[in-house]
Amino acid sequence: MECSWLRAVALVAVLVGLHGCATGMTARDRSSPSATVTLVHLNDVYEILPVEGGKSGGLARVATVVQALKAAHPAVLTTLGGDYLSPSALGTARIDGQPLAGRQMVDVLNATGLDVATLGNHEFDVSEAAFRSHLVQSKFRIVSTNVTDAGDKPFPGVPTSLIVPITSGPRSLRIGFVGVTIDSTRKPWVRYRDAIASARAELEALRGKVDAVVALTHLSLEQDAQFVEAVPGIDLVLGGHEHENWLMYRGPRFVPVVKADANARSVAIVTLSFGAPGERPSIAVRLQKIDDTIAATPAVDAVARAWVEKAFDGFRREGFSPEAVVATITEPLDGRESTVRNRAGRLTDLIASALAREADPVDVALFNGGSVRIDDVVPPGPITEYDIIRILPFGGRIVKATLDGALLSRVLEIGLANEGLGGFLHASGARREDGAWLVQGRAIDPGRRYSVALTDFLLSGGETNLGFLTRANPAVRDVRELRDIRRAVIEELRREVLTR
């Protein structure tokens, strides 16, 4: 089957989309390899059950793929390129007074048979206590070359590099792993070392001790390209952070950089073929779509569903009815990250309308695309309260405030410039026309005060490039807290159906 080509980006010599590829793409041909090792890679997994109405993903299906590969050839390792503790709708459920905060993810990944992972930036969304607890809970190995605790020491059980012995036929091989993470989530209890310098030091320590070096990365695509160019000696990069699959080759050694689709919609299957000892392995990559044609492994599925029921009990105690049908929708609601961080759509319009109605009367309603975490399309049909929790897992209150026109104009302009980021803003009541911002059809008056509905997070100053948007800003006045945004969206959906 032919592989489809994806967009070219700066600093990338060759970028190939993996969608639908059934044939391998080989960095260097070698006849009759004497040993092979297969790596099954996934990244950015927040859901333990299938997504897209059950059509795609599901860790129990991933387990089936891994087991089938091991049955044919036992030398198989399963890897994860970070982002698994958060953000997750189930992770916000409280059990015994504490949020799950990824506990369910670790348990299901343990059952799936994950071998090696690195840390993603969203691992640090949870509390330090929860993070450290999950390290103990994990049966898989975690490697992190550039992330330490506040004392600049590795977290317990998280080495800066890792050597995994594996037997392939008559050969005993040693695969070296390093792991690096983007420094985008800053917490007092986390420190980031320079990824390139840290990896170079670890590769020097691994020299002569391993048959291949694999870098597990949670970096942007551009950073991955720079990383491979700057760190010689890496044979393969298995990445994360992007939520869509990528394959690119970089550097003088034509090193593959591989990413799968988020939420286990696909896994990358990478075969390392070893010839004579000391020679670089040849590498072949293919994408395996994870969908409803693959049976779920019953034991893993049972673990996942048990956690869903525990989480649902937690939501019920908070006053939600997760299985209750809110409405029957006739159009899909697109909550994919690639959509909500770049343009408006049916879902974002619905959320903005819910904010405006909750704060009525109001001139403008604003929220950040990054608050939508479902990274999925809700198909036409019944939509439940749990679907709304999946869409907005962080919840938070809607707030109504008065903003000076100059500040509102600045916020809107930066929100538009944040295209592609979580800080891309969606608005009701405001639009840009001929280079100027209009509110309720009229140009913003810098000296006028406007009533604005927004989320408490957006008013915390925590969003990208919007650190000035806080309650302490003198141009922000009359702040009043309203209901949880999820309650307002549930009510807005019900109202839309009734008035159709």
Question: Would you name each region that the model predicts?
Answer:
Residues M1-A10:
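Bacterial N-terminal signal peptides that target proteins for export
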Residues L11, G113-V116, Y386, R442:
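Alpha-helical protein-protein interaction elements
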Residues L15, G20-T36, V40-L42, Y46, ...:
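Non-catalytic terminal accessory segments
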Residues A22-P298, N342-R357, A365, I391, ...:
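Acidic, metal/ion-coordinating pockets
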